[in-house]
UniProtKB/Swiss-Prot annotation:
GO cellular component: cytosol
UniProt cross-references to Gene3D superfamilies, sorted A to Z: 3.40.50.12230
Protein's name in the database: Methionyl-tRNA formyltransferase
Binding-site residues, (6S)-5,6,7,8-tetrahydrofolate: S111, L112, L113, P114
Source species of the chain: Campylobacter jejuni subsp. jejuni serotype O:2 (strain ATCC 700819 / NCTC 11168)
Keyword annotations: Protein biosynthesis, Transferase
Known EC number: 2.1.2.9
Similarity field: Belongs to the Fmt family.
Domain of life: Bacteria
Recorded name of the encoding gene: fmt
General function of this protein: Attaches a formyl group to the free amino group of methionyl-tRNA(fMet). The formyl group appears to play a dual role in the initiator identity of N-formylmethionyl-tRNA by promoting its recognition by IF2 and preventing the misappropriation of this tRNA by the elongation apparatus.
Length: 305
């Protein structure tokens, strides 16, 4: 039975953690995750998704929430646990060489590397209109997502939002990690092709700001930034649900309401047309498109904003 230290934080990582802890070939000896965070208006101290899952279902397994992995005491703790593998998935911290040298460190990355190294591979794939994405297992080294690839699985992501793709890739990751660890000695690591490498940065709230220039670009942002940070106009109006109707139409005025439907409306961009199904003004409740227009006394051929 192989001893595993798992390092991960969000729900994506929990799916992988669950697969490992339930498999009879592995013994989870510890979880490392981010410290509890203050959440919401009341700033309630909340554990990470992985910590909540493990403490509720496997309370005897130790959980570590260090602020730094460079602490000598933390490195000693890991060494004393004597793991056969350290598995890392969306942990949120860089592993120092002192830890990388203790055991094979296998990272699960939510892209088909070397594309989209970094913090937002799923959102970046959607923004770039990729129809395929996937998950890789790789041997970790000191560079950012630069290690040799062990295995990969791909899936179709066309017209799926980030939340849906996260779920798809989490399920793939839960499968591939078992395969990689069980067949580790038989796998020949494959170096990444550096000339094909691309980087992606962490998503910020302001990335959700949109204009009505291009319907296709706005739609891809909507998919990429659902559920967070969402998409919103400069005046704070949020588009919560929308569909791409036409990406080429150019003979209407930007921002013009083209047609009212039962619970939605068609909105002209400078190029293309969107169906707005649900929207929300800052500080107010969400409304379907038709109800919102009725409340504002807006009709066909009026400007939304």
């Amino acid at each position: 039975m192989k001893k595993i230290i798992f390092m991960g934080t969000p729900s994506y990582a929990t799916c992988i953690l669950k697969a490992l802890v339930e498999n009879e070939n592995f013994k989870l000896v510890a979880l490392f995750t981010q410290p509890d965070k203050a959440v919401g208006r009341k700033q309630i101290l909340t554990p990470s998704d992985t910590k909540a899952f493990l403490s509720q279902n496997y309370p005897s397994i130790p959980i570590f929430t260090p602020s730094s992995l460079k602490d000598k005491n933390i490195i000693r703790e890991i060494k004393d646990l004597n793991p056969d593998f350290i598995v890392v998935a969306a942990y949120g911290k860089i592993l120092p060489k002192a830890i990388l040298d203790l055991a094979p460190c296998v990272n699960l990355h939510a892209s088909l590397l070397p594309k989209y190294r970094g913090a937002s591979p799923i959102q970046s794939a959607i923004l770039n209109k990729d129809e395929k994405s996937g998950v890789c297992t790789m041997l970790m080294e000191e560079g950012l997502d630069t290690g040799a690839i062990l295995e990969s699985l791909e899936c179709d992501i066309k017209d799926k939002n980030s939340s849906e793709v996260f779920e798809l890739l989490a399920n793939l990751a839960a499968k591939i990690i078992l395969s990689t660890l069980l067949n580790f000695d038989k796998i020949t690591p494959k170096k990444q092709e550096e000339s094909l490498a691309t980087l992606c940065r962490k998503i910020k709230k302001e990335d959700g700001l949109i204009n009505l220039q291009n319907a296709r670009e706005l739609y891809q942002k909507y998919l990429a930034f659902t559920p967070w940070p969402g998409v919103f106009l400069e005046n704070g109006l949020k588009f919560l649900e929308l569909e791409l109707v036409d990406e080429l139409k150019q003979n209407a005025k930007m921002g013009e309401i083209l047609e009212l439907e039962k619970e939605s409306f068609l909105l002209a961009c400078k190029q293309g047309v969107l169906r707005i199904k649900k929207l929300q003004e800052s500080g107010k409740k969400a409304l379907d498109g038709r109800t919102y227009l009725n409340g504002k006394r807006l009709k066909s051929e009026d400007s939304l904003c």
